[in-house]
Structure formats: C-alpha cells, structure tokens
Amino acid sequence: MSFLSIKLTPSQRIMFSFLFVILVGSILLSLPISQADSSVATYWDHLFTAVSMVCVTGLFTQAVSETYSIFGQIICILLIQVGGLSLIGFIGLFALRGGRKMDFMNMATLQEALSRSDTKYFRSFIKSAFAFTLAIESLGALILTFQFVPDFGWQQGIFNSIFLAVSAFCNAGFDNFGATSIVRYVDNPLVNLTLAALIIMGGLGFSVWFDFQTQILSRGHFKKLRFHTKVVLAITAIILSAGTLLTLITEWKNPDTIGNLPFWEKLLVSFFQTVTMRTAGFASIDFTKAEPVTLLIYIFQMMLGGAPGGTAGGIKITAFLTIILYARSEILGLPNTNFMSHTIDILTIRKAFATFSVFLMVFLAGLFAIVVTDADKPLIFLMFEVMSALATVGVTANLTPTLSMAGQAIIMALMFFGRIGPLSILASLSNRKISKKEGLKYAKSSMLV
C-alpha cells in the first residue's frame, strides 16, 4: 500500500508526510555517523533541527557545522530539499514518471501540496517544478564556487556551495559556516547577490516560473502572463524596493550594523536583508544591535512572506494585497474589488481574510505562551523570534539556543504550523461533514461593527 492510497484528506496527507520526514530526519541526524567530533547535541537538538529544516525555517539550537559530519550535513541538504518541495511532491513526481494514473483525491493532494489551483498542464507543471529547482540550484552552486573554492579548497568549497544554493532556493536560511551565518561575507557582492537571486526565485513560486516557461520562453508572449504572475512580480518589486529604502533610513547611522560601511555596501546589506527577511533567514548583520524600529519593520516583512506555490512562508503577498484592495473598495464604497483590470472574486477575499486572521491569532497565542515560558527575554526579541518561526524565516536575535525547553517546543510548533499553512492545519484537524443545519442559509441580518 502506497502513501497516496491511504484514505486521508489532502490536508491530512500533507501534514502527516511532513511529520514522517521530521521523525525520520531526526533519527538520521542522531546517528553516530552523522555527528561531528565536537558535537554535544542531544536528541532534542536533532529533533529541533529536523523540524526547522523540513519546515525550511533556519532556526537552530546547535550550529550545523559544529554538530554534524559531512554525512550529517548531506542529510541536512536532503531534509531541506524534501521540505522545500514536500514529500508529496516527490511521491507524485515518481508516480507520474512511472506512468501511474492518479485518481481525483491523489491529484487534489498534489495540487494542495504544490499550491496549484487547477489541473491544466499539471503533469508538465510538476515535472517543470523539479527540473527548474535542480537547474537553478545547480547554477547558483556553480556561481558560489568562484568564492568558496578559493576560501575553503575544492572539496569543501564545492560542498559549501551546494549546501547554500539548496538552502537559499528553498528559503531555508541554513548555512554550514557556524553561528555567525554569512556575516563574514557582508560586503561580498557575489555571495550576497547570488543568494538573494536564489531566494527571490524560490519565493516567487513555481506557478510564476511555469507561466514564464509556457508564455515567454515558448511563445514570447509577455502580455499573456497570468494575472497571478503579474501581481506577484509587481508586489515583489515594490516590497523589495520599499524594504531596502526603510532599512537604509533606519540603520544609516547605526555603527553596529551598516553605519560604518560605504554607501554601496550599505545598499547591498539593506537589499540582502530585505530579501532574506521575507522568508529565507540568512543574517549578514547582528540583529541584537539593530534599531528597534528596524526589527518592527522586519517583523512586518516576515509576516508578508513570499508568493504561494513556492518555498516561502508568511501569509503570502497575494493575501495581503487582497486584504488591502478589499479595504480600499469598502472605504471608497466601490461595488467590486478591482486590480490591474481584474475583479477579485469573493472566495479569494474570504480565503485571504481567513489566512490572515488565523495567522495573527496563532502569532499572538505563540507570543503569549513564550512570554510565559521565557519571561526574562526582551519582548521585542521574543516577537522577532515568534514571527520568524511562524513565517518560516529563521532569523533570530541570538535567542533560539537560550530559550527554555518549553520555549523551544513552542518554536517547533510554530515552524510546523507556518510551513503547512494555517488553513491546511485546521482543515486536516476537521474531518467532518457539514450538517444540514450548518448548510442552511437563513434570513440576512446585520450587527454593529
């Protein structure tokens, strides 16, 4: 009996597939062959790392380079890759390549796992998603070797390049440089821009790249790009530009971050941190020394996340845009919610509000819980940590290893919740049919708001 033949809802299959990979991953990471000579990690640390990697977050209690051997780090790469594309996606790919036909439930599971709203060209889509991932990660690794091979030698340099390329494209934020992350390359344009490009491409979503392939590369029709693709590209450009500018403004005179850097390096760091803050988790500055207003800006950026259908977390930029557009139409008294010569349907609006509402409630619940378990930590750093976990970003103000075990358990739960998605989690827990009474439509009424 295969996994896809088990009688579960699509949401339940996705949730259990992630739990399965986390369990197997934590066991593999705890094996003696996976341990570095200097490792002092316990199974709890391995479990935390497995959750963070499968949920492509980037938080850790023990640094990868100091904890795992080369074999262990290869396991880490596999966990990040499977987490980024989901186990369901891999099973679906092998099933399709083997010529196996899928019933409606199996296809629905694959659609939900890869955030694909329709089945048109779905077989081509899933194959293209994996081919695109392999091609971009390989290209990114090749570019990074020009920096890492001179720094670490051929063997370690190539391995580090592959590790970071996979981590960046999957928006995981893990590196094997130690607790300082990539701070040593804060002024290196090759490393920063390559990682930023990988993060952006992974965060745009496979639907966007499939649209590019079918409309531009194959037909040369830019104007025929899907509405979703145009929206994602436009909003991504706006958010990255605004975030870079805000970081420049708030950190311009801060000597502990970018204050002492020349202008072009300030611009590079501000751009890179804006890119990584949306969902990747790499750090080229020390967040404990950043201005509080900068941390608040970053918390907002983490909440927004990237585009659906990719490796990014957060509520997704399309959901945020939908909420803003709907609020605008209500304020102006407009009958429809329009954008770029399109009217957004009510089901999309309802899903956007539901996603945001559940995300916000979980964030507040997680923040309340961790304030109770780790009351000695600064509130702004706890907010930063909770949002980083829930939005699967992975940045931290050096807080994760110092949290209590209860606090780390809360962070693990938030990472899992954020990776699966608020609505998918709730749907997987609610496996009941709507009663006749719940399905009734009563007379319309109103209440004061």
PLM features: residue spans?
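Membrane-proximal intracellular helices of multi-pass ion channels
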Residues: 1-449
